[in-house]
Amino acid sequence: YPYATELTRESTRVQQQANLDRAIRRLETDIAGQAVTTVQNATNAESAATVQAQMAAQQQLLSRMQSLKASGRIALELKPERPEYPDLPLEDGDNIIIPTRPGFVSVFGAVLAENAFIHRKDATVDDYLERAGLLREADIDAALIIRADGSVEGNTAHRRWFGGGGFMGKELQPGDAIFVPEKFDRRS
């Protein structure tokens, strides 16, 4: 399945890990600053409980991020119908894997049924999310398609002036995945 070819490189992995570590430090700082402000603004026991729940959710996110390890994968951004490999010089130690064609699309995150669904030609993001079911706290505006070729597409419809974007109508390829994050209350 050439579309899903994986190219991993050690120098890329090192750079990705450095970027991830910086993002974690930034998130730690943001959480600490937000915690102080939010606790100071809590006016009663109910709002204090809400603040505590928000802080627990943010700590969970931080813990998950801290457990991530960079892969070194380079997204080749191939066309599914006619994958052509880019003219990219190889380095010693590069690893290339051409997987077999999967027959599914994965859906995970804030959904009722995290699952791998049978790939259906012409099925869209909306079709797969309907099968998985969205949780009440699903943040569909921040949903992502993680393509089998390693590229990622975000839901940019809410950032476009004329309501375009078409995220929910995008077709998926075998091996693609949809991630739907949870909404976090960003009040301070």
Role assignments for model-derived ranges:
Residues Y1-S188:
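Ser/Thr/Pro/Gly-biased, low-complexity, turn-/loop-rich segments
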